[in-house]
C-alpha cells in the first residue's frame, strides 16, 4: 500500500477542506494517508518513508507573496525534510483578484525543485471557496495518483 503525507497550512479552513478532500480520494484509492496541520509538524526527516508528499498552503498579501502563518516555519526548513528524490505536488487556495494568486504554490514548488524533489503534478490552485471546486480537487487528486 503506497503511503502519502499531506501537510497543509490553513487560516480560514479552505486549505484544510482541500487537504481533507484530497486525503479521502487517496484513501479510497488504497493509499495510507497521513494528513497533518503545518502547525503541528517538525521538518526534520518529515518526508521520509512516504511515496508521495502533498503540501498545501494558502496565499496572503497584496504586494508580495505571503505564505499562511503556520506554514512559514516548514517552508523555511524544507531542506531538513528529506525532499531530495521525493515525489511531491502542491495545492493552495487564494483569490484571483490579487496579483499573486496562489503564489504560495509557486514558491513551494520552486523551493522543492531546488532541493531535488520531483514535482509529479502541476499545482492545484483554488480560487475562493473550495467547496465550489470539489470536482477540480477530486480530479487533481486522481491525476496525482496516476502520476506516480
From Swiss-Prot:
Keyword Repeat: no
Tree of life domain: Bacteria
Cofactor: FMN
Pfam families registered for this protein in UniProt: Flavodoxin_1
Domain Flavodoxin-like: 4-145
Protein family (similarity comment): Belongs to the flavodoxin family.
Task performed by this protein: Low-potential electron donor to a number of redox enzymes.
Protein name: Flavodoxin
